[in-house]
């Protein structure tokens, strides 16, 4: 859009989008959607248009379940018409506890456990915490421990109350924006997908994830040792020499998927750990 703005001036750019959120926005569309990649749309474009018109809908005949908007500090929306027809602008997303943030749009289908999704983003945030303030450093660690317990089907209804309490405390007392928004994925999934939590803490069985633990591995027979996964890993969890099979240290891995997206040979796989 930069060249167009330069040629046509700011008035033209402000004519696009909404009154309070003019212009366009670039989003990274990924997840369980037919067409993934970077897209640029007018502010105010609805989630339905992005997922089903631009994204091509959900592959393999699966049902749409949610979109995580705004990266690890964002919130999840549901498959309700109210959320699907929500404009992607600052005020509309704020009204449901989400945010544009980094512009990430992760589409999820019916085979996604939202508790696992919340844990995924909490693990990332906990690893990224600088550790300066206690609410973020210790609070996110405690929340991650609770989510681990819930995923293992060992949680309780009291854990859900504790997650709510910790989320409120951390968001109100953390020193920087990372800590203040770190709990949004947990807060939004508790609000909109509470049934997923209840399957773990009441039924003690989730038909989607069954409390399974997964780890990422590199298949040596497919790995060419190109090093792309290693260069893209934000946690330096991948090791290996050029032209030799690489390996992933799952003690460092945060399951962000950067290696999976970077590998041109399909050598990255997720396997279930034995109990």
PLM regions: where:
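Terminal amphipathic helices with adjacent charged low-complexity linkers/tails
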Residues: 59-93, 191
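Short, contiguous acidic and Ser/Thr-rich linear segments
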Residues: 34-46
């Amino acid at each position: 859009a930069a060249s167009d703005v330069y040629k046509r001036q700011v008035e033209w750019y402000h004519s696009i989008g909404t009154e309070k959120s003019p212009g366009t926005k670039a989003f990274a569309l990924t997840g369980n959607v037919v067409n993934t990649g970077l897209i640029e749309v007018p502010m105010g474009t609805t989630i339905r248009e992005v997922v089903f018109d631009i994204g091509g809908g959900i592959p393999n005949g699966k049902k749409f379940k949610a979109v995580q908007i705004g990266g690890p500090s964002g919130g999840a929306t549901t498959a309700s018409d109210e959320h699907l027809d929500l404009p992607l602008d600052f005020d509309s997303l704020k009204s449901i506890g989400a945010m544009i943030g980094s512009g990430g749009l992760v589409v999820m289908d019916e085979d996604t456990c939202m508790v696992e999704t919340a844990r995924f983003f909490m693990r990332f945030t906990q690893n990224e915490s600088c550790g300066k303030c206690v609410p973020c450093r210790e609070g996110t660690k405690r929340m991650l421990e609770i989510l681990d317990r819930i995923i293992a089907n060992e949680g309780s209804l009291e854990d859900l109350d504790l997650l709510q309490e910790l989320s409120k405390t951390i968001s109100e007392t953390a020193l920087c924006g990372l800590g203040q928004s770190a709990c949004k994925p947990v807060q939004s999934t508790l609000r909109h997908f509470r049934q997923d939590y209840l399957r773990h803490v009441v039924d003690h069985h989730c038909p989607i994830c069954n409390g399974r633990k997964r780890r990422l591995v590199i298949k040596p027979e497919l790995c060419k040792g190109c090093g792309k996964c290693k260069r893209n890993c934000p946690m330096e969890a991948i090791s290996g020499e050029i032209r030799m099979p690489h390996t992933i240290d799952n003690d460092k891995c945060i399951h962000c998927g950067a290696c999976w997206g970077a590998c041109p040979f399909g050598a990255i796989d997720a396997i279930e750990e034995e109990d």
